[in-house]
Swiss-Prot record:
It comes from Granulibacter bethesdensis (strain ATCC BAA-1260 / CGDNIH1). InterPro entries: aa-tRNA-synth_I_cd-bd, aa-tRNA-synth_I_codon-bd_sub2, aa-tRNA-synth_I_CS, aa_tRNA-synth_I_cd-bd_sf, Glu-tRNA-ligase_bac/mito, Glu/Gln-tRNA-synth, Glu/Gln-tRNA-synth_Ib_cat-dom, GluQ/Sye. CDD domains: GluRS_core. Monomer. Signal peptide: none annotated. The keyword Protein biosynthesis applies. A motif ('KMSKS' region) lies at residues 252-256. This is Glutamate--tRNA ligase 1.
Amino acid sequence: MHSLTTHKHVRGGDMTIRTRFAPSPTGLLHVGGARTALFNYLFARHHGGEYLLRIEDTDRARSTPEAVQVILDGLDWLGLSPDQEPVFQSTRETRHTEVAHSLLERGMAYRCFLSPEELQAQRDQAAADKRPLRINSPWRDRDLSEAPSGIAPVIRLRVPQEGETVVDDLVQGPVRVANAELDDMIILRSDGTPTYLHAVVVDDHDMAITHVIRGDDHLTNTFRQVQIFKALGWDLPRFAHIPLIHGADGAKLSKRHGAVSVLEFEREGFLPEALCNYLLRLGWGHGDAEILSRDEQVALFDLDGVGRAASRMDYAKLTHLNGVYLREADDQRLTTDLCRRLDLSPDSDASSRIRRLMPKLKERARTLVDLAESARFVIERPSGPKDAKAAALLSDEARGWLRALLPQLQATDFSAAAVDQALRAFAEEHGLKLGQIAQPLRVALTGGTTSPPIDATLEALGASEVTSRIEAV
């Protein structure tokens, strides 16, 4: 079990800001969760605080080590790894149970012996009355001497029935609910295991969390969790409920809209800094700057810039932004990624050729998948023209020109400048426009009609490879 503090951290007389990202390991890190993690990270960094990770793995059936690793890998890829080792909620069940029993001993909670049949009757009545279900337990005030045999009780919190609960949310503003609308929630199930709502409160307190930043789908939970904090006499954290991410059609984001998990975006060739930049600007505003470095994000981010309306995922805009980041990315870093995607040894000749071409290759690419595809000709000799347009360029006459050109190319040192000069001289000598020789040459070398500039392409491939490819046509 992780040893946790049970007090607010103090530094220089002031409370240290502590945030947490608390996902359930379901097998993927959703892009919405990634944005929540990013906001928690940036808020903590902006205020000189700490950003923690809690894995809410109390659902034993779904919470596998593999599912946990997906979350850890996704956060690591995004550059959002926590400041401390993750806390696993499942290891803290004893603590959760102790706190529940302390509430019971102080009269802030009670044992409830409602049978499954009695509970179902209340559900049926609520449905018939077309009203929200609110469990009314007679055991709130009944004497335990009347308890039936054969029913293992749950423990319910004794929620105030008068007044209202107000959450002064840092994004949504003041949100209130009449306490009469809240039922006495279960904090310990009949099998002795703690409920999610109860465990979260205990963990947030013990981890000294000062700010709970999460999706606004948790807002209704917050009213209930506030009751637990108050019953325990613990300081409340500040709450900030951020809007969810929807698809372009306004519906909840799902696979039908496109990639939804962080590792899908990685596979599809997005850079982590581009995805983070996009997610930050999705629902947070600060001036007109679209591209912000991580340091700039930390310096500028605060919750007052977060909007209340749901954001719509725009994959086209993300792809455009990714292209901007690609063009600014380090060439060796991109080459290393392409070697992985193309199953190349980083020390191979092909890797060196790709590295030389990278400044030109990345000019048109929008994703790393695009980039890898555009570099494929470096490692795979074309089996012929890729399409009809390319085939038309490689006419018998054009093949003759290429054979005539080859000795002139071989006479150069194969630098881009020398290749360019040789091509221009050949075109002028034969009364051709430069494109009339450059385009067939491009098809011969790459199989297609697009590539980096032809002089750079020849320089990267080298004399031997260029000779082999021209002779093959």
